[in-house]
Regions:
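Outer-membrane beta-barrel channels and translocator barrels
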Residues: 14-16, 72-74, 111-115, 178-180, ...
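Outer-membrane beta-barrel "beta-signal"
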Residues: 110-115, 428-440
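Extracellular/periplasm-exposed beta-strand and loop segments of Gram-negative cell-envelope proteins
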Residues: 32-39, 49-56, 92-97, 134-141, ...
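Membrane-embedded beta-strands of outer-membrane beta-barrel proteins
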Residues: 9, 63-65, 104-108, 171-173, ...
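Conserved small/polar residues in nucleotide/adenosyl-binding loops
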Residues: 1-5
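Transmembrane beta-strands of outer-membrane beta-barrel proteins
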Residues: 17-22, 73-81, 117-123, 182-188, ...
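Surface-exposed extracellular loop regions of Gram-negative outer-membrane beta-barrel proteins
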Residues: 68-89, 101-105, 187-200, 295-301
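Transmembrane beta-strands of outer-membrane beta-barrel pores
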Residues: 26-30, 83-87, 125-129, 190-194, ...
């Protein structure tokens, strides 16, 4: 179960050929009993505490800005960036962990427009630092998630402070063709990423580093027919990631002595191919004083993993189906007030299979490494692992907007959801969100 609060202030201003925008965003989530499963996996070091399923508080602050400039009737350039600080802490009486992350992102791009075509190019850079403190006296195991496997952080014996640093650089090329009743969009993307996790005072297991290369293609074909809009979106993504375990020793008993690396082991190597196809249909009705829209979305994603995770060679196949039916209604009230309502029903269902072969322990002249792996899937037999999960839910969103001035309006948003999840045990949960919003 979760309770979320969110507020933000944003605005924009046009100065001749220059357009500026920016804002401040704050959110807080109070979560109860959330744990990882096949459909929800941790993203960063500070989410490692989610493996405990303890009550937690997640707080996020974000400052962002954007700028665009018209160089000529056909050429536009732009730049945007943001800073985000995220806190994740255990709200139980034990206070086992607390994590903090700082993220800085900056990107820029250029767009060239013709009568029926657009061409674009962009580049982005992201820098992220994290810190997680953990009570090592706790009997509960805390996990982290390198390359798709959960490793117990107790293997880094004696550690109480973990740090990570990540850098990401990507480039993208886009083309778009616009016709009277249809449009076609292509996006080709490449990204490289480096991530290092380094615990302090951890004996001879000092951490690991990961390097990722990703190339992806995304297409979108849109066709309109009277009040109907149909969108087909194929996507393909290929990732290659390597992760190394770095072994170090402290030659003296002094805590300030320099650690020396005496071995580096290939902890993991992964090649991942993801293919996805989704379809969306909407029907709009703007007659009278009401605006109504029916929305239907279905999609299928298949993921193939071929990776070596010490000391196993693993082949993993995962499939995920999602669907949603929603109805959107906007009602114009007296004095230019507006009320919007969006009820929906959705389903997410996934399965996973895994085949594993064990290899010999890696050794070198100076030492050997033994790393225990704990997996989230139900073991069927010695070489085969399978898991299925299904999430069925209903939700609703409501927004009220009241004009205060020609350039200012205020209102609120209200969201709620109820979910039934089987993975393989059946659980029932829900959450709500209330926000006060100012529009400029």
């Amino acid at each position: 179960m979760c309770i979320r609060d969110r507020d933000y202030v944003s605005g924009n201003r046009k100065l001749g050929l220059l357009w500026l925008a920016g804002g401040i965003d704050w959110s807080q989530s109070l979560l109860e009993g959330r744990k990882w499963n096949l459909l929800s996996q941790p993203d960063y070091l500070i989410t490692a505490g989610d493996s405990l399923g303890e009550p937690q508080r997640i707080e996020k602050y974000r400052i962002y800005g954007q700028a665009a400039y018209v160089l000529s009737p056909k050429i536009k350039v732009g730049i945007d960036g943001d800073y985000t600080a995220t806190s994740n802490e255990d709200r139980s009486s034990y206070h086992i962990y607390h994590g903090m992350a700082h993220l800085i992102r900056i990107s820029g791009g250029i767009v060239y427009e013709q009568v029926r075509r657009r061409f674009g190019a962009s580049i982005h850079y992201t820098h992220r630092t994290e810190e997680l403190t953990y009570d090592t006296d706790s009997k509960d195991k805390l996990y982290t998630f390198p390359l798709g496997y959960w490793l117990p952080m107790q293997e880094l014996s004696g550690s109480f402070l973990f740090r990570s640093q990540g850098k990401r650089l990507g480039v993208s090329l886009q083309t778009e063709t616009l016709k009277e009743h249809w449009s076609l969009f292509h996006d080709l993307f490449y990204e490289t990423q480096q991530l290092a996790d380094n615990p302090n005072n951890s004996g001879n297991l000092r951490g690991w580093e990961e390097r990722l290369h990703q190339i992806s293609y995304q297409g979108r074909f849109t066709r309109t027919n009277k009040s109907w809009t149909h969108i087909w979106s194929p996507t393909a993504r290929f990732n290659q990631t390597t992760a190394n375990r770095i072994l170090q020793r402290n030659p003296t008993t002094s805590s300030s002595a320099i650690w020396t690396t005496f071995a580096t082991y290939r902890l993991a190597r992964q090649r991942m191919l993801s293919t996805q196809l989704s379809y969306e249909a909407t029907k709009n009705d703007t007659s009278g004083e009401k605006v109504s829209t029916w929305q239907m979305t279905v999609g299928w994603n298949r993921l193939e993993n071929d990776f070596y995770i010490y000391p196993f060679t693993v082949k993993q196949y995962t499939g995920l189906f999602h669907g949603e039916i929603a109805f959107f209604r906007q009602i114009r009230l007296p004095k230019e007030n507006k009320l919007s309502i969006r009820p929906s029903v959705y389903i997410v269902s996934g399965y996973g299979t895994e085949i594993k072969w064990e290899k010999e322990t890696q050794k070198d002249e100076n030492g050997s490494a033994e790393i225990k792996l704990e997996q989230n899937m139900q073991k069927v037999n010695e070489d085969f692992i399978a898991r299925t999960a299904t999430r069925l839910g209903i939700g609703t969103e409501m927004e009220y907007r009241h004009p205060i001035h020609s350039a200012l309006s205020a209102g609120f948003r209200l969201k709620g959801s109820l979910e039934q999840t089987t993975s393989p045990q059946s659980t029932l949960g829900g959450g709500g969100n209330f926000s006060i919003v100012i529009w400029l």
